[in-house]
Amino acid sequence: ADDDCLPRGSKCLGENKQCCKGTTCMFYANRCVGV
């Protein structure tokens, strides 16, 4: 589902989900951030 994603600000490394649309995983910060 489209809502099964990581919202902005969540940890993203090692998670089973992708960052939500409009955000990306910042590797060094381990956070989903807006692009």
UniProtKB/Swiss-Prot annotation:
GO molecular function term, any single one: toxin activity
Coiled coil: none
Signal peptide stretch: none
Cited SUPFAM superfamilies: omega toxin-like (SSF57059)
Subcellular location: Secreted
InterPro entries xref list: Assassin_bug_toxin-like
Pfam families assigned to the protein according to its UniProt record, in alphabetical order: Toxin_30
Disulfide bonds: 5-20, 12-25, 19-32
Main subcellular localisation: secreted
GO CC, alphabetical: extracellular region
Superkingdom field: Eukaryota
Keyword terms: Calcium channel impairing toxin, Disulfide bond, Ion channel impairing toxin, Knottin, Neurotoxin, Secreted, Toxin, Voltage-gated calcium channel impairing toxin
Matching PROSITE patterns: ASSASSIN_BUG_TOXIN (PS60010)
Notes concerning its domains: The presence of a 'disulfide through disulfide knot' structurally defines this protein as a knottin.
Family: Belongs to the venom Ptu1-like knottin family.
General function of this protein: Binds reversibly and blocks P/Q-type voltage-gated calcium channels (Cav).
Protein name: Toxin Ado1
Source organism (scientific name): Agriosphodrus dohrni
